[in-house]
From Swiss-Prot:
Full protein name: General transcription and DNA repair factor IIH subunit TFB5
Gene: TFB5
Purpose: Component of the general transcription and DNA repair factor IIH (TFIIH) core complex, which is involved in general and transcription-coupled nucleotide excision repair (NER) of damaged DNA and, when complexed to TFIIK, in RNA transcription by RNA polymerase II. In NER, TFIIH acts by opening DNA around the lesion to allow the excision of the damaged oligonucleotide and its replacement by a new DNA fragment. In transcription, TFIIH has an essential role in transcription initiation.
Family: Belongs to the TFB5 family.
Known partners and oligomeric status: Component of the 7-subunit TFIIH core complex composed of XPB/SSL2, XPD/RAD3, SSL1, TFB1, TFB2, TFB4 and TFB5, which is active in NER. The core complex associates with the 3-subunit CTD-kinase module TFIIK composed of CCL1, KIN28 and TFB3 to form the 10-subunit holoenzyme (holo-TFIIH) active in transcription.
GO cellular component: transcription factor TFIIH core complex; transcription factor TFIIH holo complex
Length: 65
């Protein structure tokens, strides 16, 4: 039995795929638990929030005149 220190992240499948792609550049996922849960390094949570905000903003449609 092993114990891991981490934060449980719950997300939908689309956001999880985005997080997995971010993990390829900067390893922070400790364990991929199932299709909607990840265990991530607690010291990377603020970085992940900022990166997700940037990536999700890129995928947001806006009406520009």
């Amino acid at each position: 039995m092993k114990a891991y220190k981490g934060m449980l992240l719950t997300c939908d499948a689309a956001v999880k795929q985005l997080i997995l792609s971010l993990d390829e550049r900067n390893r922070f996922i400790i364990m991929d638990l199932d299709e909607t849960h990840l265990l991530i390094s607690p010291d990377r949570i603020d970085w992940l929030r900022a990166e997700l905000e940037v990536e999700l903003e890129k995928n947001t449609y806006t009406l520009e005149p």
